[in-house]
Amino acid sequence: RFVNRIPAKKHDHFLIPAGTVHCSGAGTMVLEISATPYIFTFKLWDWGRLGLDGLPRPVHLEHGEKVIDWQRDAQWVHQHLVNQFEPVAEGNGWREERTGLHEREFIETRRHWFSEPVLHHTGGGVNVLNLVEGDEAIVDSPTGAFEPFTVHYAETFIIPASVGDYRISPSARASGHPLATIKAWVRS
């Protein structure tokens, strides 16, 4: 009656600005990109989960009620927060799309689909990436700033700002299958 359910499938992207009631459903793998996921979260319900101390985790009904944005109905959420992808660029064997985050967030996220090597640039900021499709990829530096390394599905890796250019390529194991990464950085 008071909360809507939005079925999620692989590679869906949900923007969750402050004040949005949300949870993940059973059997869902979630990649949460957030600056403060546990500092400012007011749990309205916690499904009976226990904390590290073995006690039920606290809920914050009074605080939560005060920060809910009550103007966000199901129609608004579907129009503004679900799968708001925007094509940005494409080249030989790759395409880039802006996935969010919400305009109130200071983090930018992009998804790259690729079947060929893709050149990236840190833009002077730290890049945090996750391989969200495909078994494995190779990350290397055209300038030799670091030793090449392999990332596997669902692994997160960080590229320091000082690296500049770096490349992500399908591994021999991934040949013939599209891969995808999510890249996040602090907006300037």
Show which residues each predicted segment covers.
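Conserved hydrophobic/aromatic beta-strand scaffold that supports enzyme active sites
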Residues: 5, 13, 21, 30-32, ...
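Generic recognition of flexible, low-complexity loop/linker segments
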Residues: 3, 18-21, 86, 96-100, ...
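Ligand-binding loop in jelly-roll beta-barrel domains
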Residues: 20-39, 148, 152-153, 160-188
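Short acidic-glycine-tyrosine-enriched beta hairpin
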Residues: 3-15, 139-163
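Loop-centered beta-sheet repeat module
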Residues: 1-47
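C-terminal amphipathic alpha-helical segment
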Residues: 41-123
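Glycine- and acidic-residue-biased ligand/ion/polar-headgroup-sensing regions
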Residues: 1, 27, 111-146, 152-154
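Intrinsically disordered, low-complexity coil segments
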Residues: 52-55, 86-92, 101, 140-148, ...
